[in-house]
Amino acid sequence: MYPKKTHWTAEITPNLHGTEVVVAGWVWELRDIGRVKFVVVRDREGFVQVTLKAGKTPDHLFKVFAELSREDVVVIKGIVEASKIAKSGVEIFPSEIWILNKAKPLPIDIWSETPDLATRLKWRSVDLKRPRNLVVFTVASAMLRSIREVLYGEGFVEVFTPKIIVTSTEGGAELFPVMYFERVAYLSQSPQLYKEQLTASLERVFEIGPAYRAEKHNTDYHLNEFISVDAEAAFMDYNDIMDILEKIMRRLASTVSEYAPKLEEVGIKALMELSNIPRVDYDEAVDRLRQLGYAVNWGDDFTVEMQKALMKYYGPVYFIVNFPASLRPFYTKRKDGEKSESYDLIINGIEVASGATRIHKRDELEEEMKKRGLDPRLFESHLSVFDYGMPPHAGFGLGFNRLVTALLGLDNVRHATLYPRDRYRVEP
């Protein structure tokens, strides 16, 4: 029986010189230079060198070494010694090695050249062993924790809303149908209507969960299943919500900076510093784009290329505010007639979040629905809530996969998604 792991590889430092430890992980590299042999062991946190030296290491371990292959699962017990030669400044001299499972030759190379994305995603579970991926998803987990902590600190309650629904949240047709016993239902594209309803009871709510959109996109920034961070708060407007988003973004920059050495080691140049985020009126953004030579009309939405171009004036992180009402969902509160109390949060040219002040009076909401060709009767279960004390409220929806992509400077949202689901991919 093998012993339990006592340390992550990253915890094996020169300070542990002379200490017996147990590490567990996968064989990353094997080197044989005669009387000295090396096993580099990988776990989630990094690497550690295990050194076998004739006259110092038990003889039977050289036979075990001969059986080892890359990616074999191992447990190793040994004594830590400080080293001026080992890359990490430390090595382990083993007293015992257990091979828990043998690995066949891998179908893709995770050590040197990176295969094309389609091949990597085909073998995603193997590809996730790559050190760069380990860092990306470890940082992503820390980012989620930080988002939760900020929202809890602002008095929000975490909720979970249905993902099987009977009508569209946005009033469109881009929904995935599912058979729900004897009737057709749909996968939820957003918790928007539920979180609005919850402001009439819980006041401030947020949800982190999957969302589904049957959009036939095939771009670097679109997925059909993604993790959405949604928040809604009573007695707030869009400026209040942007203030909260600013707090989240500053906290995230700080969180990411804690992983600076690991990110730099795998070649990721992340956004780690953030000052106040400028709030750019839509009209000003249109004028700036025209100055840059873009043929953009008032009422047009902005492309990723345009949003990247605006970084020249506003830096890598900025809000665009007060969009034309025609570009926003039906539940968005209007501002001065044709505009709206709305915003997008742009990071490195990518729209990562959108939000607005919402309409909180039933008659105004029904009127907005009719203007857009929607039948209020299809939304009766939602509209009825507005009859019993719906407060003024505002909120945001944030695409977490896009957020990770933008903050870490990745070139494709699939790199920030464990098992991506897009128009052409539904496995593994």
From Swiss-Prot:
GO terms for molecular function: aspartate-tRNA ligase activity; ATP binding; magnesium ion binding; RNA binding. SUPFAM superfamilies: Class II aaRS and biotin synthetases, Nucleic acid-binding proteins. It is found in: Cytoplasm. Residues 192-195 are annotated as: Aspartate. Mg(2+) 2 binds at residues 351, 354. Its cofactor is Mg(2+). Keywords: Aminoacyl-tRNA synthetase, ATP-binding, Cytoplasm, Ligase, Magnesium, Metal-binding, Nucleotide-binding, Protein biosynthesis. GO terms for cellular component: aminoacyl-tRNA synthetase multienzyme complex; cytosol. ATP binds at residues 213-215, 351, 399-402. It is an enzyme of class 6 (ligase). Mg(2+) 3 binds at residue 351. InterPro entries: Aa-tRNA-synt_II, aa-tRNA-synth_II, aa-tRNA-synth_II/BPL/LPL, Asp-tRNA_synthase_2, Asp/Asn-tRNA-synth_IIb, NA-bd_OB-fold, NA-bd_OB_tRNA. It holds the Pfam family tRNA_anti-codon. The record marks 87 as: Important for tRNA discrimination. Its main location: cytoplasm. It comes from the Archaea. The keyword Nucleotide-binding applies. L-aspartate binds at residues 170, 213, 354, 358. Its EC number is 6.1.1.12. Belongs to the class-II aminoacyl-tRNA synthetase family. Type 2 subfamily. Catalyzes the attachment of L-aspartate to tRNA(Asp) in a two-step reaction: L-aspartate is first activated by ATP to form Asp-AMP and then transferred to the acceptor end of tRNA(Asp). PANTHER family: ASPARTATE--TRNA LIGASE, CYTOPLASMIC, ASPARTYL-TRNA SYNTHETASE. Homodimer. This is Aspartate--tRNA(Asp) ligase. It comes from Pyrobaculum aerophilum (strain ATCC 51768 / DSM 7523 / JCM 9630 / CIP 104966 / NBRC 100827 / IM2). The lineage of its organism: Archaea, Thermoproteota, Thermoprotei, Thermoproteales, Thermoproteaceae. The gene is aspS.
